[in-house]
Amino acid sequence: MSLFLDTARIEVKAGKGGDGAVAFRREKYVPDGGPAGGDGGKGGSVIFKVDEGMSTLMDFRYNRIFRGKPGEKGMNKGMHGRGAEDLIVHVPQGTTVKDNETGDVLVDLIEKDQEFVVAKGGRGGRGNIRFATPRNPAPEVAENGEPGEDKILLLELRVLADVGLVGFPSVGKSTLLSVVSNARPKIGAYHFTTITPNIGMVQVGYGDSFVMADMPGLIEGAHSGAGLGIQFLRHIERTRVLLHILDMSELEGRDPYEDYKTINDELESYNLRLMERPQLIVANKMDMPEAAERLAEFKEKLAADLEADQEMPEIFEVSGLIKTGLQGLLARTSELLAQTPEFLLYDEDALGDEVAYYGFEDEEKPFKVSRDDDGGWRLSGEKIEKLFIMTNFDHDESVMKFARQMRAFGVDETLRSMGAKDGDYVRIQKFEFEFVD
């Protein structure tokens, strides 16, 4: 089983805030002690942090749920509960975090030690010391802690490389990477020897270096899933220069020009501006007897197919096996990197409109009303459900406060207008009460 994993679906659940306390100060010589219930502590958030030592999402294969700790409950004498420590989850550099339901990109973690809160911990509930008023100096009211955020996330890893090697299987990409860098990829005389991206550091002269990535071989239909498909096409997205490796020998019986067109069609079909990147054609295996003749045929076909305003692409003749022609290729690659800015990983359509429009909008109604199969009424909605969860039903004053808040929301009026009658059951989550007209 491969130890390389570049996608993972996980659940993150931030910690619940601590419950506020209902307490009263009872001490000698303090006749008017009053309320003394402290607030609950904040729940622990779940935070992703870039770890340069990680190179795969393998840690998420079996560990798929990450829970933050709850905050401590409030205490007597006005003492607040301790906030929970945040849960730090380490991820590889180059991890993109998406909302699994909407597909929206939440963050692209590419900087060293970069952190991002993926699930925020819940606020601590207020103790009864917060609810004291001149009319009610000793309230028996406190809040439960706010639930922490709960999300399903999709993680996608894209390797951080400056240069990407693309081409059909067995054209010599891994061999080329092994002789120009410190990488030691698996090399074999069969297709798909490379099944995971290999990365190597290439030194060009003094102090000049770049990262090169050898991608698993592409085949026709890769953009729609053929072969290893888009599983590894995503890793090309962060590169700034592409080296298109072509096999000029007759060993595989392939037509270099058809291979060239097919691979470029796949890159274009993937639709991530890959064809906008500078691309150098690398005519590999030029040590073979028939290579020069096949290269001449390739150049003829390429020239005949160019548009009138198109320039002939740069072609470098190399042999990864006997290490010829490599210095010129690496020097030109380094020049292109110096001239080419980074490409945005996501286009405007993927990230949405960047222009913000401000204006008045109708406030979202705090609740919705529906009917259950047995004829009962069900209240739902983020605001009213959050209010319900944070209400401490162990104290009558808290229950009365909840009833007042529901009336302020317009729940009674809405139920009445929809035909609710005395004695009808009204439900919020698993709680049930009777409607009183």
Swiss-Prot record:
It is found in: Cytoplasm. One of its GO terms (biological process) is ribosome biogenesis. CDD domains: Obg. Residues 359-437 form the OCT domain. InterPro entries: G_OBG, GTP-bd, GTP-bd_Obg/CgtA, GTP-bd_prot_GTP1/OBG_C_sf, GTP1-OBG_CS, GTP1_OBG_dom, GTP1_OBG_dom_sf, OBG_GTPase. GO terms for cellular component: cytoplasm. Residues 161-338 form the OBG-type G domain. Mg(2+) binds at residues 174, 194. Keywords: Cytoplasm, GTP-binding, Hydrolase, Magnesium, Metal-binding, Nucleotide-binding. GTP binds at residues 167-174, 192-196, 214-217, 284-287, 319-321. Its cofactor is Mg(2+). GO terms for molecular function: GTP binding; GTPase activity; magnesium ion binding. It comes from the Bacteria. PROSITE patterns: G_OBG, GTP1_OBG, OBG, OCT. Residues 2-160 form the Obg domain. Its EC number is 3.6.5.-. Belongs to the TRAFAC class OBG-HflX-like GTPase superfamily. OBG GTPase family. Monomer. An essential GTPase which binds GTP, GDP and possibly (p)ppGpp with moderate affinity, with high nucleotide exchange rates and a fairly low GTP hydrolysis rate. Plays a role in control of the cell cycle, stress response, ribosome biogenesis and in those bacteria that undergo differentiation, in morphogenesis control. This is GTPase Obg. It comes from Lactococcus lactis subsp. cremoris (strain SK11). The gene is obg.
